[in-house]
């Protein structure tokens, strides 16, 4: 699948989305899918984390908690499509901007978590202004992940910069999260625009497209670089640490041009 860069105007740097609830606590939501003793969770973090969150809530409150795991953009699309007949009670995880978009579209219930008072000082203003439907629950840094064993076998130097990924030796070796459906992909896009400027960022992505083996629907498909299905990935640093901890020859690098971060929400 190749991206159409005529979509440029749809990715202007505008603040997008939010949701409701906070952490594992009082996740009271929309007027819909609430059946007595049952809670449906749309989850945009790793599947294992979704399982742990659902289990912890079920155990603490004696509520049958079920989850559906999708990328941030996919969940936002589902919530929009289900506006007149909501199918879930809580949206847990995923990048903050799509949560704000849901808030601005009136898709979320008002709920301000009492835990917001514990937020890091630099995010207090944002929380005060837009925390009426969502809460920040984590922070993640962007980086370049790579299978160092596969790169060594191909005699390719480890990429340290976004610019390195344009080199011809990386043709067919890179996977990249599709910014149309992936919150990770959107965060990479906005970071590149911040670093390079809008026109240069889209020119960069058009050039990078020549080296892309596949566009993934989620930024969490890092198992592909562990198995060698891809040699290089652009995503969040913690995902590469997780693969390395499993024993895979995977490392991450913070791009030399600078990097961005995202806030996760519930």
Task: Report residues per predicted region.
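Extracytoplasmic ligand-binding site segments that recognize negatively charged/polar headgroups
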Residues: 44, 48-51, 87-229
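C-terminal segment of classical bacterial N-terminal signal peptides
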Residues: 20-32
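Periplasmic-binding protein-like
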Residues: 204-208, 213-215, 244-266
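Bacterial N-terminal signal peptides that target proteins for export
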Residues: 2-19
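A ligand-binding cleft/hinge motif common to bilobed small-molecule-binding domains
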Residues: 97-101, 231-249
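Generic structural signal for residues in well-ordered beta-strands
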Residues: 65-67, 174, 250-252
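Residues embedded in well-ordered beta-strands
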Residues: 40, 143-145, 260, 265-266
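Early extracytoplasmic/lumenal segment of secretory-pathway proteins
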Residues: 35-101, 223
């Amino acid at each position: 699948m190749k991206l159409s860069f005529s979509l440029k105007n749809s990715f202007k740097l505008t603040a997008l989305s939010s949701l409701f609830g906070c952490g594992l606590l009082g996740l009271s939501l929309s007027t819909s899918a609430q059946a007595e003793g049952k809670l449906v969770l749309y989850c945009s973090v790793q599947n294992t984390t979704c399982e742990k969150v659902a289990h912890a809530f079920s155990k603490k409150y004696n509520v049958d908690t079920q989850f559906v795991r999708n990328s941030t953009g996919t969940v936002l699309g589902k919530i929009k499509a289900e506006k007149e007949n909501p199918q879930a009670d809580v949206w847990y995880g995923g990048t903050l901007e799509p949560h704000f978009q849901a808030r601005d579209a009136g898709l979320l219930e008002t709920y301000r978590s009492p835990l917001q008072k514990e937020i890091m000082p630099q995010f207090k203003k944002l929380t005060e202004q837009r925390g009426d439907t969502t809460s920040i629950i984590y922070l993640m840094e962007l980086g370049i992940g790579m299978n160092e064993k596969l790169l060594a076998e191909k005699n390719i130097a480890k990429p340290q910069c976004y610019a390195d990924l344009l080199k011809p030796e990386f043709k067919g070796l890179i996977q990249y999260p599709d910014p149309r459906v992936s919150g990770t992909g959107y965060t990479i896009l906005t970071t590149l625009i911040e670093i390079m400027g809008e026109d240069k960022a889209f020119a960069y992505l058009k050039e990078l497209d020549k080296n892309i083996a596949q566009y993934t629907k989620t930024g969490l498909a890092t198992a592909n670089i562990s198995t060698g299905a891809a040699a290089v990935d652009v995503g969040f640093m913690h995902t590469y640490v997780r693969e390395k901890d499993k024993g895979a020859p995977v490392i991450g690098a913070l791009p030399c041009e600078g990097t961005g971060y995202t806030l996760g929400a519930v």
